[in-house]
Amino acid sequence: MELDLSPTHLSSSPEDVCPTPATPPETPPPPDNPPPGDVKRSQPLPIPSSRKLREEEFQATSLPSIPNPFPELCSPPSQKPILGGSSGARGLLPRDSSRLCVVKVYSEDGACRSVEVAAGATARHVCEMLVQRAHALSDESWGLVESHPYLALERGLEDHEFVVEVQEAWPVGGDSRFIFRKNFAKYELFKSPPHTLFPEKMVSSCLDAQTGISHEDLIQNFLNAGSFPEIQGFLQLRGSGRGSGRKLWKRFFCFLRRSGLYYSTKGTSKDPRHLQYVADVNESNVYVVTQGRKLYGMPTDFGFCVKPNKLRNGHKGLHIFCSEDEQSRTCWLAAFRLFKYGVQLYKNYQQAQSRHLRLSYLGSPPLRSVSDNTLVAMDFSGHAGRVIDNPREALSAAMEEAQAWRKKTNHRLSLPTTCSGSSLSAAIHRTQPWFHGRISREESQRLIGQQGLVDGVFLVRESQRNPQGFVLSLCHLQKVKHYLILPSEDEGCLYFSMDEGQTRFTDLLQLVEFHQLNRGILPCLLRHCCARVAL
C-alpha cells in the first residue's frame, strides 16, 4: 500500500495529526520550574513528571514539521483519522470501508444481478463472489469490465481497484455498467514472449537505446521508477477541421512516458518545443473503443481512448487515438497500465498465481495449462520410450493416437446396433461451454476479442454456409482464424474432421480434447475456452 505524504494532503505539524498531552490552560506551571534554557544538565536535579512532559512538548514544537504517516495509530478510538484528498488517487481504503453498497453486474448475455458489497471491496473480491454464485471454475482470468455503451468505451478493472469508488464516479442516470467476463489478456504482459507485446521499433529509452533486451529486463524497466523507458509510434489523433465542424483524423508521432502522453508537431522530433502534451498517466484511464468506425469515424478498428478521471460524461475532453494494427494497440494499452500502476500490477499477478496454486493444493481441479514447448511426441512401441524428432513421424503418431481414441470411443458407445450411440455423441457438444450455437463469424471474433486476443482462445459454432458443418474459431498471433469441421460417414457411423478425413473424431468433444494436447493442423493448442457464464 502506498501512502501519499505530501503536505497538501496531511497536516503540517504533528499536533494537528496526533495531539500530544499538555498542561491544561487553567493550571499554572509549578513555581519551581525554571525555563529550559537555565537548566544545567550536568547537575543532578529531581525532574517531576509534569516537567518532563513540558520539555517533551517544547522539543516537539521546536522540531521541523514532519507529517505523521500513520494517524490512525495514534488517534483516539472514537475519532477517525482525517485524510485529505481522494482515497482512490493514493490507493487507500475509503473512509468507511465497511459501508454496504449495491453494485449491479451484467453478464455477457445481458442478464443483470445486484450484489451487496462493502465499500472497500476490490474487483478481485467481487469476482470471487460472483464465481461462487455462478458455480464457475475459479481462475485468474475472471474480471470486471467497466463499460460505457454511450461512449463505446470499455476497460478491465485491475484486481486492486475499489468497485464502489469506480461506480460513484459515473454520471447519474447513465448507461454505464459492470460486465462479468473472462479476460485472458489481463496478465499476458508477464507471460508473453519478449517482442509479442512490445516490438523493438516501439520501445525506446531516454538513457540509451539497447537492442536485444530480455523480456524480464524490459518489464523491470517499466516497473522501476528510476528508469525512463518510453513507447513511441505513429497514431491517428481525432481533431476538429477548421471551419467545417467535422472531426478529422490526422497522423502524429506519439510518445508515452512516465510524465504523460505527448505527440510531436514536427515529424518524429523529440525536441520539447515540438512536443504537445495530451494527458497525464496518473490522472487518466485508458479504454478500448468498441464501435470506433460507427461512432467516431475511425479509419481502422484498432482504437483506444484516454479519458481523464475528472471527466464524467460527454464526448468533450476524450482523447481518442487510432493505431494501425492490433499489436500496436496492445502495446500502447499494456505500457499505459504499467506506467499507471507500476509494481502494484505485478503484485496483483503474484497474488493471483498464489491463489491459483493454493486452490490446486486444496484439491480444486486446476485448468490444464501447457505450452507448445513443453509437449513432445513420444514413441512407446519398444521396450523404452523415445522422443520423436522427425516432424512427419510425430504427425503420424498423432494420427494414430486419434485413431486409437476413435476405436476406444466406438467400443464404449457400442450397443446392440453398431452406431446407435451416434445420436448421443453428435449432440454432446451442446452441453460444453465452448459451443456457442449458430452465431456469425463477426460475433465469434467479437467474443474472442472481448475475452482477450491470446494464443489458444477458441470456441466452436455452427457453420452458416454448410448446414451440417461446424467452425472452430481460434486466436493466434492476435488474429482470429476459422477452421471448418465437416462431417463424414464411414460404415454407417458419423465422424468429424478438419483435414478432409485424415484425422477423424466421433464427436466434437473428442476433437476439442485431442487438440488441447496436440496441435495437429492448428497453429497452436486449444488453451482457453471462450465461454459465457450466466449470473
Curated annotation (Swiss-Prot):
InterPro entries xrefs: BPS-dom, GRB/APBB1IP, GRB7_RA, Grb7_SH2, PH-like_dom_sf, PH_APBB1IP, PH_domain, RA_dom
Single GO MF annotation: protein kinase binding
PTM statement from Swiss-Prot or TrEMBL: Phosphorylated on serine and threonine residues in response to activation of receptor kinases. Phosphorylated on tyrosine residues by TEK/TIE2. Phosphorylated on tyrosine residues by PTK2/FAK1, and possibly also other kinases. Phosphorylation is enhanced by activation of receptor kinases. Tyrosine phosphorylation is essential for activation of down-stream protein kinases. Phosphorylated on tyrosine residues in response to NTN1 signaling. Phosphorylation promotes stress granule disassembly during recovery after cellular stress.
The organism's place on the tree of life at top rank: Eukaryota
GO cellular component, one term: cytosol
Positions of the Ras-associating domain: 99-185
Protein's GO biological process: negative regulation of translation; positive regulation of cell migration; signal transduction; stress granule assembly
Domain PH, chain residue ranges per copy: 228-341
Alphabetical list of Pfam families matching this protein: BPS, PH, RA_2, SH2
UniProt KW Repeat keyword: no
Quaternary structure (record): Homodimer. Interacts (via SH2 domain) with EGFR, ERBB2, ERBB3 (when phosphorylated), ERBB4 (when phosphorylated), EPHB1, INSR, FGFR1, PDGFRA (tyrosine phosphorylated) and PDGFRB (tyrosine phosphorylated). Interacts with SHC1. Interacts with RND1. Interacts (when tyrosine phosphorylated) with FHL2 and HAX1. Interacts (via SH2 domain) with RET and PTK2/FAK1. Interacts (when not phosphorylated) with ELAVL1. In stressed cells, but not in normal cells, part of a complex that contains at least GRB7, PTK2/FAK1, STAU1, ELAVL1 and TIA1. Interacts (via SH2 domain) with KIT (phosphorylated).
Residue ranges of the region described as Disordered: 1-90
Organism: Mus musculus
Biased composition (Pro residues): 21-37
Topology within the bilayer: Peripheral membrane protein
Domain SH2 stretches: 434-530
Segments forming a coiled coil: none
Keyword annotations of the record: Cell junction, Cell membrane, Cell projection, Cytoplasm, Lipid-binding, Membrane, Phosphoprotein, Repressor, RNA-binding, SH2 domain
Residues with Phosphoserine modification: 364
Subcellular location: Cytoplasm; Cell projection; Cell junction, Focal adhesion; Cell membrane
Family statement drawn from the similarity comment of this UniProt entry: Belongs to the GRB7/10/14 family.
Free-text domain note: The PH domain mediates interaction with membranes containing phosphoinositides.
Function: Adapter protein that interacts with the cytoplasmic domain of numerous receptor kinases and modulates down-stream signaling. Promotes activation of down-stream protein kinases, including STAT3, AKT1, MAPK1 and/or MAPK3. Promotes activation of HRAS. Plays a role in signal transduction in response to EGF. Plays a role in the regulation of cell proliferation and cell migration. Plays a role in the assembly and stability of RNA stress granules. Binds to the 5'UTR of target mRNA molecules and represses translation of target mRNA species, when not phosphorylated.
Residues with PTM Phosphotyrosine: 187, 341
Protein name per UniProt: Growth factor receptor-bound protein 7
